[in-house]
Amino acid sequence: LLRIFEHEGDMILDWYYEYFVETTKNVDYAIAAVSPATQTTTEGSTTPAPQTEVTLERLGDFPMPLEVQVTDLNGQVWTFYIPLRLMRGEKTPNPEQAEGWMVQEDWPWVEPSYTFSVPVPTDEIVSITIDESMLLADVDRSNNTWEPSKE
Protein backbone atom coordinates (compact mmCIF):
# COMPACT_ATOMS: atom_id res chain seq x y z
CA LEU A 1 0.00 0.00 0.00
CA LEU A 2 2.82 2.40 0.90
CA ARG A 3 4.50 1.85 -2.47
CA ILE A 4 1.21 2.61 -4.28
CA PHE A 5 0.93 5.93 -2.41
CA GLU A 6 4.56 6.73 -3.21
CA HIS A 7 4.03 5.93 -6.89
CA GLU A 8 0.83 8.00 -7.14
CA GLY A 9 2.23 10.93 -5.15
CA ASP A 10 5.66 10.76 -6.79
CA MET A 11 7.44 11.17 -3.46
CA ILE A 12 9.09 9.08 -0.75
CA LEU A 13 6.75 8.31 2.19
CA ASP A 14 8.80 5.88 4.33
CA TRP A 15 9.34 8.68 6.86
CA TYR A 16 5.56 9.24 7.17
CA TYR A 17 4.84 5.56 7.72
CA GLU A 18 7.54 5.33 10.39
CA TYR A 19 6.28 8.39 12.30
CA PHE A 20 2.57 7.67 11.92
CA VAL A 21 2.49 3.91 12.52
CA GLU A 22 5.57 3.19 14.61
CA THR A 23 5.64 6.14 17.07
CA THR A 24 3.38 8.16 19.35
CA LYS A 25 4.82 11.51 18.25
CA ASN A 26 2.38 14.32 17.54
CA VAL A 27 2.04 17.10 14.98
CA ASP A 28 2.11 20.64 16.35
CA TYR A 29 3.12 23.73 14.42
CA ALA A 30 2.85 27.42 15.31
CA ILE A 31 3.36 30.83 13.76
CA ALA A 32 6.19 32.06 15.97
CA ALA A 33 6.77 35.53 14.49
CA VAL A 34 5.59 37.87 11.75
CA SER A 35 7.69 40.96 11.10
CA PRO A 36 8.54 43.46 8.38
CA ALA A 37 11.58 42.43 6.36
CA THR A 38 14.53 44.79 6.15
CA GLN A 39 17.01 45.51 3.42
CA THR A 40 20.49 46.97 3.63
CA THR A 41 21.14 50.16 1.70
CA THR A 42 24.37 50.90 -0.17
CA GLU A 43 25.37 53.08 2.79
CA GLY A 44 25.07 50.07 5.12
CA SER A 45 21.93 51.10 7.00
CA THR A 46 18.78 48.99 7.09
CA THR A 47 15.39 50.11 5.83
CA PRO A 48 12.01 48.38 5.66
CA ALA A 49 11.56 46.10 2.64
CA PRO A 50 8.20 45.67 0.85
CA GLN A 51 7.82 42.15 2.22
CA THR A 52 7.20 40.23 5.43
CA GLU A 53 9.24 37.59 7.24
CA VAL A 54 7.21 34.71 8.70
CA THR A 55 8.80 32.33 11.20
CA LEU A 56 7.16 28.98 11.87
CA GLU A 57 7.98 26.65 14.73
CA ARG A 58 7.61 22.89 14.98
CA LEU A 59 6.50 22.25 18.57
CA GLY A 60 5.66 18.56 18.13
CA ASP A 61 8.05 15.77 17.18
CA PHE A 62 6.24 14.71 13.99
CA PRO A 63 7.49 16.66 10.95
CA MET A 64 5.00 17.34 8.15
CA PRO A 65 4.98 19.42 4.97
CA LEU A 66 3.00 22.62 5.46
CA GLU A 67 0.68 24.84 3.49
CA VAL A 68 0.60 28.39 4.83
CA GLN A 69 -2.11 30.65 3.45
CA VAL A 70 -1.57 34.42 3.36
CA THR A 71 -4.42 36.84 2.58
CA ASP A 72 -3.83 40.54 1.87
CA LEU A 73 -6.09 43.62 2.10
CA ASN A 74 -7.16 43.21 -1.55
CA GLY A 75 -8.36 39.66 -0.92
CA GLN A 76 -5.50 38.07 -2.84
CA VAL A 77 -4.52 34.68 -1.41
CA TRP A 78 -1.14 32.98 -1.63
CA THR A 79 -0.41 29.44 -0.50
CA PHE A 80 3.20 28.89 0.54
CA TYR A 81 3.97 25.19 0.34
CA ILE A 82 6.88 24.06 2.50
CA PRO A 83 7.96 20.48 1.73
CA LEU A 84 10.14 18.39 4.00
CA ARG A 85 13.58 17.41 2.86
CA LEU A 86 12.67 13.83 3.93
CA MET A 87 10.07 13.67 1.13
CA ARG A 88 12.54 14.11 -1.71
CA GLY A 89 9.74 15.68 -3.74
CA GLU A 90 6.82 18.07 -3.47
CA LYS A 91 3.07 18.09 -3.72
CA THR A 92 1.32 19.25 -6.87
CA PRO A 93 -1.27 21.95 -6.10
CA ASN A 94 -4.97 21.35 -6.55
CA PRO A 95 -6.32 23.22 -9.62
CA GLU A 96 -8.06 25.80 -7.40
CA GLN A 97 -4.76 26.45 -5.57
CA ALA A 98 -2.54 26.72 -8.65
CA GLU A 99 -2.75 30.52 -8.85
CA GLY A 100 -0.84 31.87 -5.88
CA TRP A 101 0.90 28.54 -5.13
CA MET A 102 4.50 29.20 -4.08
CA VAL A 103 6.84 26.31 -3.32
CA GLN A 104 9.44 27.21 -0.71
CA GLU A 105 12.80 25.67 0.13
CA ASP A 106 12.61 22.31 1.94
CA TRP A 107 12.33 22.41 5.74
CA PRO A 108 15.05 20.13 7.17
CA TRP A 109 13.40 17.90 9.79
CA VAL A 110 16.20 18.57 12.31
CA GLU A 111 15.47 22.32 12.39
CA PRO A 112 12.73 23.35 14.87
CA SER A 113 12.04 26.67 13.13
CA TYR A 114 11.72 27.89 9.55
CA THR A 115 11.56 31.43 8.14
CA PHE A 116 10.29 32.48 4.71
CA SER A 117 9.42 35.75 2.98
CA VAL A 118 5.99 36.88 1.82
CA PRO A 119 6.01 39.46 -1.02
CA VAL A 120 3.56 41.73 0.81
CA PRO A 121 4.27 44.45 3.40
CA THR A 122 3.22 43.41 6.91
CA ASP A 123 0.66 46.22 7.20
CA GLU A 124 -1.17 44.87 4.12
CA ILE A 125 -1.61 41.33 5.46
CA VAL A 126 -5.05 40.40 6.82
CA SER A 127 -4.19 36.88 7.99
CA ILE A 128 -1.64 34.09 7.88
CA THR A 129 -2.85 30.54 8.55
CA ILE A 130 -1.09 27.20 8.78
CA ASP A 131 -3.24 24.45 7.23
CA GLU A 132 -6.33 26.45 6.24
CA SER A 133 -7.89 23.23 4.88
CA MET A 134 -7.53 21.58 8.33
CA LEU A 135 -6.11 18.35 6.88
CA LEU A 136 -3.11 18.34 9.23
CA ALA A 137 -3.49 16.43 12.52
CA ASP A 138 -2.20 19.43 14.51
CA VAL A 139 -2.87 18.92 18.24
CA ASP A 140 -3.11 22.67 19.00
CA ARG A 141 -4.65 24.88 16.32
CA SER A 142 -4.81 27.95 18.58
CA ASN A 143 -1.37 29.06 17.38
CA ASN A 144 -1.90 28.35 13.66
CA THR A 145 -3.33 31.76 12.70
CA TRP A 146 -1.84 35.24 12.84
CA GLU A 147 -3.86 38.41 12.37
CA PRO A 148 -2.60 41.96 12.88
CA SER A 149 -3.41 43.40 16.28
CA LYS A 150 -6.26 45.91 16.28
CA GLU A 151 -4.59 48.82 18.07
Predicted regions: what they are:
Residues R141-S149:
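Terminal edge beta-strands and adjacent linker/stalk segments
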Residues D106-D123, D140:
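A surface-exposed beta-strand-loop module
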Residues V68-D72:
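Conserved aromatic beta-strand anchor motif in extracellular beta-sandwich/beta-rich domains
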Residues L1-E43, T47, T52-V54:
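Amphipathic alpha-helical substructures
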Residues E132-S142:
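Short acidic/polar inter-strand loop motif in beta-rich domains
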Residues Q51, P63-E67, I125:
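Exposed beta-strand and adjacent loop surfaces of beta-rich binding modules
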Residues L56-G60:
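Asparagine-centered strand-capping/turn motif at beta-strand->loop junctions
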Residues Q76-S113:
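Solvent-exposed beta-strand/loop surfaces of large extracellular or lumenal domains
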